[in-house]
Structures are given as structure tokens and as C-alpha cells.
Amino acid sequence: MMTQQIDDPMIPVPIPQQVPAKEGIAKLPGTRLGYWDTGGDGTPVVFLHPASGSALVWLYQQPVFAKAGYRVIAYSRRNYYNSDLAAEDNPGIGSEDLHNLIELLGVARFHAVSSAAGGSVATDYAFSHPERLLSLTVSSNNLAARNGYIAETAAIIRPKETESLPRWYWELGPSYRAANPEGVERWKELNHKSETGKGARQKVANVVTPAKLETLKVPALLMAGAADLATPPSIMRMIARHVPDNEVVVVAECGHSSYWERPEFFNRTVLDFVGRHAN
């Protein structure tokens, strides 16, 4: 297990200038999803956003991964910015929306990089279409575990009262809130812009249990913020017991949004991981 070397947590990281990217609305079976794509001949990296975000939130990652030679793609799931709502009678399966999107974009194999709720979709995809993934990065998510002791423990450490707290309070760690109040406000703006409607909750194709995790065929990077109230390092260590090929990274002085709170470390760690799983 790897732990972040302590950078200075009191120095805010400025948002870098974005590189050109095509923005569009993908017309898929049963829905339309907003996305952006930097294009090019590089290996694709597809970013899957948290429930607090959308395709808009990857400001720290887009130019860094593109300049590292990758084709960078992000999209908004149903119920989020520029995408349709999920219908009550047919909400669809999030991982199949992802599959339909990459088929439309002509992507053969790719690296999936996810945060929080995006990790549930990415993991579901890894079970349904492992042949399409070069690697799987999951930050701040229990890999969609719905049954078994991991899911039960996650429920215990995240009581219902948590939902009454402001989202920014329990998603952003105390070090970040102290060091970067402007970043907190920007995060709030993106959160407000991302959550465009309350459609139905989408379904998953696979029921994830500890036994199911042991069948995962994709190399996995498991990241947890040391101060994450929702998915702390303890949950990631439980998951790591069952995932055959995994690396666990604990991000120091970080809450639930490591891609935003500690972007330089997040980017370095993920770039190193995907670089070692190119084939």
C-alpha cells in the first residue's frame, strides 16, 4: 500500500488552462449524453464523474492527461449536465450507456478513471466488458459493493444523518476547506451546474459482493482520501483483500474529492498507473 508523500497542503493549486476539446451530445439507445473529447491518436482515458459532478469537473485532469499523450474523454451520465434525465419506467444501465458511448466514439480499449459514484459505473463496466479496459482507477468508492460485509460496513460508517449535511462539507476534507476557500466556492459552482435534475436512479448489470470482486479481471488502482468520511482507507483495504490485481493509495489530508483537492498527486499517481498498464 502506498501513502502520499506530504506536499504543502496550504498552497492551493491553480486550475490549468484547458486544451481544445470537441464538445457534443451523443445520441445513444434510449438517451442523449453530453461529452467532450480531446481527440488524437493517443490511448483513450475516460473519466467518470462523482454524483456531485459531471463532465465539467475534470478541469485539473483534462490538459495534464492530454499533454501526456492521451486522448481524454469525459461525459455526463443521465441526470447530469447536458444529458437527459433517466426515466422512471426505463432508467437504463449506467455501464451500458458508457459502452454505447465508446462504441459511438470508435474507442476500442481504454483506461477508466473514476471518482465516487463514477466508480460504481466503472466497476460494473469492468465486470461486463473486461476485454475493453486496459485499467480501472476507482477513487472514493466501494466498487459498487451492494451485498456482503463491505457494503454493510460502508453503511455503518455513513449514517443517514450525513445526508443532511451540505454536500461540500462532507465531500471536501478539512485541510482543503481551510487552505482553499476559493476552490471550495468553485467546487460548489460546478456541483450546482452539474446536478441538473432528479431523474430515476440507474441500474447496474452486476451484483457486487466480496466473492464477485475476486473475479475482477482488470488491474485496479484503488484510491482513498485519508479524511474521506464516506469511503475511508479502511473500506479500500477491505476491497483490496478481494481484488486480484490491485494497488491501494491513500491520499494524505484529503476528503472524498481527491481529483479536486489533491490534483497534482492524483494526476501523477494515475498517470504512473496507466503508464504501466498500456497493453
Predicted regions and their residues:
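Short alpha-helix in the alpha/beta-hydrolase fold that links the catalytic acid
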Residues: V218, P232-R241
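Active-site loop/oxyanion-hole signature of alpha/beta-hydrolase fold enzymes
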Residues: Q62, K67, I73-S114, R268
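Flexible "cap/lid" loop of the alpha/beta hydrolase fold
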Residues: T123-S128, L133-E163
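Catalytic active-site module of serine/aspartate enzymes centered on a nucleophile-bearing elbow/loop
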Residues: N246-N279
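Conserved alpha/beta-hydrolase catalytic His-Asp/Glu region
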Residues: N147-G148, P159-T215
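Short beta-strand/loop motif that positions the catalytic acidic residue
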Residues: L216, L222-A224
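Conserved HGGG/HGGXW glycine-rich cap/lid loop of the alpha/beta-hydrolase fold
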Residues: T31-D84
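Acidic catalytic loop of the alpha/beta-hydrolase fold
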Residues: A227-T231
